[in-house]
């Protein structure tokens, strides 16, 4: 068997003809481990100013010529298209094709693109390189290729299934997220994509990650369908110590919703890519954490051992909840991470960042292990990410789940039937579920509730909801210091039987 010999990052990989040769994540890991033992070299931009200084509208004019999609002349159902550099996408990435016998560089050519009104000198871009790539597949119709994967910028990637539109993103790795020292954003600097056979229903992508304090080798197996599933294997190597490492990170956006209504009049009742963090803890507990757009940076940690799963979900898909014909938030997927093997002790961490508009991703969720590897030592993360609009799959089948969280001014009904505000905040939480719908409406359902030191539960009531055939919890809370966050939890029970997941909410400071 011929041994692969890496010449350098700048030299094209040697072609192989041995039938026994096969490319694997170990080949990428050798490069990652070698890089980790060297000083970091920041990527260099070769982008002419006409592209670097362009506005978004100009960048949008640069379109890939669909007739020149990579693998267009092959019978494989997968096709590749590439992103041109421009704006802040100003650093080239290397993209290689892996066949049964060879690895070869996919070279940039301006002929792949149409440039619209963008004036440029062809000689200055002939060796420019790509900013990233996208994968096309006939996911919605047999006679039409639709984009299902986008790899563009840092270590971000977006994935969709049938009938979905792009929303939240996944990332390769998060470093020092929300720490005062500032976040470090690793980037995928090189990709290797296996040429699929005509009958293949999955696509394999390898990636080399690099940053000032970490390197990594990744293998992504994309399995498109009604739910598109990505199987991820990563091998991480630290160059230097980090404050916090985030594995399987997800990035999303939450601007406003019924738990935190828009401060300005808006025809859209809700505006978000995701509205909650769902966690299946190692001890079996299911937790639902509605998202906020806080006035100050907020970080929540859920400590556990060997998590069974977590994800940023878009619960509630009625168009009337969003009313947005352009951006179709009702069609944006949830993303669910299922760990493989035991991840040990650590925390699922949620970061919520203030934002004034929907163009900024302000939500991050990831797994952060208690024990970090020493520089040069390998750390593995293996997991799948499911991109789905079927949230019924993403909670315990025998437990009720939180359908909606609403926040309102707390009040008390007077003898004259007029409601009088009493200085409290009311939370209206609707629980529903297949098993709960089977319960008689006179079932004595009650709530187990708790609140942190900064609040007091003034009243808690549970009543049957005939519309959803579930139960509604109304909890009135008095906050002691509005400048501090207030934590609260609730779950529905019937005697000693737990009926629902745990609703875990943080009321932001200065609300």
From Swiss-Prot:
GO cellular component terms listed in the entry, alphabetical order: outer membrane-bounded periplasmic space
Signal peptide: 1-22
Pathways involved: Glycan metabolism; osmoregulated periplasmic glucan (OPG) biosynthesis
InterPro entries attached to this UniProt entry: Gal_mutarotase_sf_dom (IPR011013), GH-type_carb-bd (IPR014718), Glucan_biosyn_MdoG/MdoD (IPR014438), Glucan_biosyn_MdoG_C (IPR007444), Ig-like_fold (IPR013783), Ig_E-set (IPR014756), MdoG_OpgG (IPR023704)
Major localization class: periplasm
Subcellular location: Periplasm
Gene3D superfamilies: 2.70.98.10, Immunoglobulins
An individual GO BP term: beta-glucan biosynthetic process
Superkingdom: Bacteria
Pfam families: MdoG
GO MF term list: carbohydrate binding; catalytic activity
Keywords: Periplasm, Signal
Family from the record: Belongs to the OpgD/OpgG family.
Role according to the record: Involved in the biosynthesis of osmoregulated periplasmic glucans (OPGs).
PANTHER family xrefs: GLUCANS BIOSYNTHESIS PROTEIN, GLUCANS BIOSYNTHESIS PROTEIN G
Protein known as: Glucans biosynthesis protein G
């Amino acid at each position: 068997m011929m041994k692969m010999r890496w010449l350098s990052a700048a030299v094209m990989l040697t072609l192989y003809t041995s039938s026994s040769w096969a490319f694997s994540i170990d080949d990428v890991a050798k490069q990652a481990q070698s890089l980790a033992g060297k000083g970091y070299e920041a990527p260099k931009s070769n982008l002419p100013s006409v592209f670097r200084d362009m506005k978004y509208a100009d960048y949008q004019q640069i379109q890939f010529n669909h007739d020149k999609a990579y693998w267009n002349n092959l019978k494989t159902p997968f096709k590749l298209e590439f992103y041109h550099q421009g704006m802040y996408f100003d650093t080239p990435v290397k993209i290689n094709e892996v066949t049964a016998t060879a690895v070869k560089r996919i070279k940039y050519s301006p002929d792949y693109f149409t440039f619209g009104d963008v004036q440029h000198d062809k000689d200055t871009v002939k060796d420019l390189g790509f900013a990233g790539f996208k994968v096309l597949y006939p996911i919605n119709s047999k006679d039409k290729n639709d984009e299902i994967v986008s790899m563009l910028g840092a270590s971000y990637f977006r994935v969709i299934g049938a009938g979905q539109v792009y929303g939240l993103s996944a990332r390769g790795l998060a470093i020092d997220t929300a720490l005062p020292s500032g976040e470090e954003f690793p980037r995928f600097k090189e990709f290797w994509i296996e040429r699929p056979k005509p009958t293949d229903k999955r696509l394999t992508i390898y990636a080399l990650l690099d940053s000032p304090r970490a390197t990594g080798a990744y293998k992504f197996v994309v399995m498109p369908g009604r739910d598109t599933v990505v199987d991820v294997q990563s091998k991480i190597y630290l160059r230097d110590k980090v404050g916090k490492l985030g594995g399987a990170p997800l990035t999303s956006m939450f601007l406003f919703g019924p738990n935190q209504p828009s401060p300005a009049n808006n025809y859209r009742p809700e505006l978000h890519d995701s509205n909650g963090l769902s966690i299946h803890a190692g001890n079996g507990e299911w937790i639902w954490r509605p998202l906020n757009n806080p006035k100050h940076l907020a970080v929540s940690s859920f400590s556990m051992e060997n998590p069974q799963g977590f994800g940023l979900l878009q619960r509630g898909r009625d168009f009337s909840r969003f009313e947005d014909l352009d951006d179709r938030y009702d069609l944006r997927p949830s993303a669910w991470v299922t760990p493989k093997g035991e991840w040990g002790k650590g925390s699922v961490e949620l970061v919520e960042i203030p934002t004034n508009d929907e163009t900024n991703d302000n939500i991050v969720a990831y797994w952060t292990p208690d024990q970090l590897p020493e520089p040069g030592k390998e750390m593995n993360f293996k997991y799948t990410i499911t991109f789905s609009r079927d949230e019924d799959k993403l909670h315990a089948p025998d437990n009720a789940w939180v359908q909606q969280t609403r926040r309102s001014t707390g009040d008390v009904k007077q003898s004259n039937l007029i409601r009088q505000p009493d200085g409290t905040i009311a939370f209206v939480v609707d629980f529903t579920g297949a098993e709960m719908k089977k319960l008689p409406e006179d079932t004595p359902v009650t709530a187990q509730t708790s609140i942190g030191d900064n609040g007091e539960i003034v009243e808690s009531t549970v009543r049957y909801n005939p519309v959803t055939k579930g139960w509604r919890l109304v909890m009135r809370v008095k906050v002691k210091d509005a400048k501090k966050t207030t934590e609260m939890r609730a779950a529905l029970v019937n005697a000693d039987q737990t009926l629902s997941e745990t609703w875990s909410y943080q009321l932001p400071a200065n609300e």
